[in-house]
């Protein structure tokens, strides 16, 4: 075997250095662009040839070996029979180890003018170079072809001829660099041991990113074929010109070495056998190059040609073999509620090319591009992290007492907290009973009691009480005023209970800001400027939705500006909420935290007054100077 051929086998000559094994930043952990090891793709696979010496019967063949002065030695002759191991010269002999079995070869049938050798692969592979070592004189003309569709179509890699112009009508790359034909490997000398070497990463491909589309088109193969088109004789001079040579008309090849690697787009450094593929039993098959990638960089597929199921937030890319950039696939943001996602180019473009992942088949009663909200009929349980499988709980609204939301035919609760929209006069978290002062729970809600006090919620009969106060005066006509820049609260069916709406049953002591020592002595957890948005009767308690406009004090609590809920003392205990909190108005509120639940409590110990800038300044001064 020639020196360059041995170098190609051992180190890959310049091909590997310029190509796949020269990937920037290659490491065993495949942190950057990486490629599986290279090897002989013919090893462990079946090589095909049109004919084989002695395939039908024993044949006689002869060959010359020349001296240095080109005079022919005495020809040597032998027999071949494909059915007898010691006389066989099968195509598989071209794929065995060139070092362990250097004197084995394939030989065609006698007097064959055209011959074909073909390697069929079970998957797509990267092909880098071919080394052929001839026992017979090299052909006067031959073609190297490849297929990328398992033999359906073929494209030429290289033409070989003693005269490219005369044989194929092509220019010779010995004269014109980069031409598709060459005369370099078509000389009949030497009569035996002549090499043919083809490098797939020759110019102009040797400077490209080895995973670019251009290089893939050049290197990717599923089949490789060599067509031997024209024999030529050994050029040595016979001493006896009258002695006609016999049995020299055949092709014979020692080695057919197809160097390449598993094709993984730069996303794997190891490969395993393709499912269902069985290697040919031959010595050294444990060194064979397998065809299914063990993908890294969050990629998947036999060739890491697409992103893993939950990593489609950006377009898939091959790694960059020049810079070493792995171009990893990025995970979709599905909040733990989906196993797969897909890339949507419209979503990608709408995001400014930042995120294009759309979660598939959201689980755990969630929906949305990122499974980011509960489905209609479910609400967000704030006690659980949203990634928890039970973060969305089913609404439990009473079918009679709950109102149907606009544009829906089914009753749904507030998806943020599970509150049900109740019909007029209906109370309770699930809208399952009448409010105090109402009766006749039914399809149209509950009716007001025709009493000065409360009435029986079922019959409507008045219930007398010594605490009842005359209700026969008119209620003030109060309507909450919303700032046009602020969105109005949507749950209008749940009305707020306050002394203003139920003044006949409620007496709240007017609060004044006394001395600073008394104010500081209350040790309030929070002091806020708020605007009342709405109040909601929950049957056992009232929730007041507010907008925090300014935080004057907060201790261990993390309180921010924006919407929040306050929890006044239960109106079921007092008949109203005290201190008075009327929707649409602004207040200064100082109160305590329920250490068990973390709720902001408003009760008779709280300080509540209508907001005035002067009041705010005075309280801030007390907090800074006195409350230490």
UniProtKB/Swiss-Prot annotation:
The keyword Amino-acid biosynthesis does not apply. Residues 506-627 form the NTR domain. GO terms for cellular component: extracellular region; laminin complex. GO terms for biological process: animal organ morphogenesis; axon guidance; basement membrane assembly; cell migration; substrate adhesion-dependent cell spreading; tissue development. Residues 30-261 form the Laminin N-terminal domain. Residues 262-331, 332-394, 395-448 form the Laminin EGF-like domain. Glycans are attached at residues 56, 163, 353, 483. The keyword Disulfide bond applies. SMART domains: C345C, EGF_Lam, LamNT. Residues 1-18 form the signal peptide. It is found in: Secreted, Extracellular space, Extracellular matrix. Disulfide bonds join 262-271, 264-293, 295-304, 307-329, 332-341, 334-359, 362-371, 374-392, 395-413, 397-420, 422-431, 434-446, 506-576, 520-627. Keywords: Disulfide bond, Extracellular matrix, Glycoprotein, Laminin EGF-like domain, Repeat, Secreted, Signal. May play an important role in neural, kidney and vascular development. May form a homodimer. This is Netrin-4. It comes from Pongo abelii. The lineage of its organism: Eukaryota, Metazoa, Chordata, Craniata, Vertebrata. The gene is NTN4.
């Amino acid at each position: 075997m020639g020196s360059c051929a041995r170098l190609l086998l051992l180190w890959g000559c310049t091909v590997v250095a310029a190509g796949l094994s020269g990937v920037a930043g290659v490491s065993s952990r495949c942190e950057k662009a990486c490629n599986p090891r290279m090897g002989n793709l013919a090893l462990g696979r079946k090589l095909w040839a049109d004919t084989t010496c002695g395939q039908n019967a024993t044949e006689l063949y002869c060959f010359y070996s020349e001296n240095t002065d080109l005079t022919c030695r005495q020809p040597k002759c032998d027999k071949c029979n494909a059915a007898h191991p010691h006389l066989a010269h099968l195509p598989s002999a071209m794929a065995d180890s060139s070092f362990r079995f250097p004197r084995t070869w394939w030989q065609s049938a006698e007097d064959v003018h055209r011959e074909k050798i073909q390697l069929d692969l079970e998957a797509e592979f990267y092909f880098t170079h071919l080394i052929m070592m001839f026992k017979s004189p090299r052909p006067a003309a031959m073609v190297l072809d490849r297929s990328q569709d398992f033999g359906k179509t073929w494209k030429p890699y290289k033409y070989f001829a003693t005269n490219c112009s005369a044989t194929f009508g092509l220019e010779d790359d010995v004269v014109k660099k980069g031409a598709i034909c060459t005369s370099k490997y078509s000389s009949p000398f030497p009569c035996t041991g002549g090499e043919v070497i083809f490098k797939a990463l020759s110019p102009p491909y040797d400077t490209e990113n080895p995973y670019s589309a251009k290089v893939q088109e050049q290197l990717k193969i599923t089949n490789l074929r060599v067509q031997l088109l024209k024999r030529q004789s050994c050029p040595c001079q016979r001493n006896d010109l009258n002695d006609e040579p016999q049995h020299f008309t055949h092709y014979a090849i020692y080695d057919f070495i197809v160097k390449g690697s598993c094709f993984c787009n730069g996303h794997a450094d190891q490969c395993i056998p393709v499912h269902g593929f069985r290697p040919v039993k031959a010595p050294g098959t444990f060194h064979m190059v397998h065809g299914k990638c063990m993908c890294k960089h969050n990629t998947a597929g036999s060739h890491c040609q697409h992103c893993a199921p939950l990593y489609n937030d950006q377009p898939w890319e091959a790694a960059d073999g020049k810079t070493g950039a792995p171009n990893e696939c990025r995970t979709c943001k599905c909040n733990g509620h989906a196993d797969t996602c897909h890339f949507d180019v419209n979503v990608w473009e709408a995001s400014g090319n930042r995120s294009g992942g759309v979660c598939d088949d959201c689980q755990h009663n969630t929906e949305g591009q990122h499974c980011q909200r509960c489905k209609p009929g479910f609400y967000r349980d704030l006690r659980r992290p949203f990634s928890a499988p039970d973060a969305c709980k089913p609404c439990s609204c009473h079918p009679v007492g709950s109102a149907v939301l606009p544009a829906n035919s089914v009753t749904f609760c507030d998806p943020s907290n599970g509150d049900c929209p109740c019909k007029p006069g209906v109370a309770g978290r699930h809208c399952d009973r009448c409010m105090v002062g109402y009766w006749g729970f039914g399809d149209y809600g509950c009716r007001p009691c025709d009493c000065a006090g409360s009435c029986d919620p079922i019959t409507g009969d008045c219930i007398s009480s010594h605490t009842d106060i005359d209700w026969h005066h008119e209620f003030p006509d109060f309507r909450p005023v919303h700032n046009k820049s602020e969105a109005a609260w949507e749950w209008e069916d749940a009305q707020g209970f306050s002394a203003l709406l139920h003044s006949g049953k409620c007496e709240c002591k007017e609060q004044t800001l006394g001395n600073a020592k008394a104010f500081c002595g209350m040790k309030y957890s929070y002091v806020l400027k708020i605007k009342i948005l709405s109040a909601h009767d929950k049957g056992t308690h009232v929730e007041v939705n507010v907008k925090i406009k300014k935080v004057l004090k907060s201790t261990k609590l993390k309180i921010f500006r924006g919407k929040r809920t306050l929890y006044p003392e239960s109106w079921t205990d007092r008949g109203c909420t005290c201190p008075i909190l009327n929707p649409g108005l602004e207040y200064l509120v100082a109160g305590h935290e329920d250490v068990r639940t973390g709720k902001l409590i408003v009760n008779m110990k709280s300080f509540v007054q209508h907001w005035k800038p002067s009041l705010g300044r005075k309280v801030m001064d007390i907090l800074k100077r006195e409350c230490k």
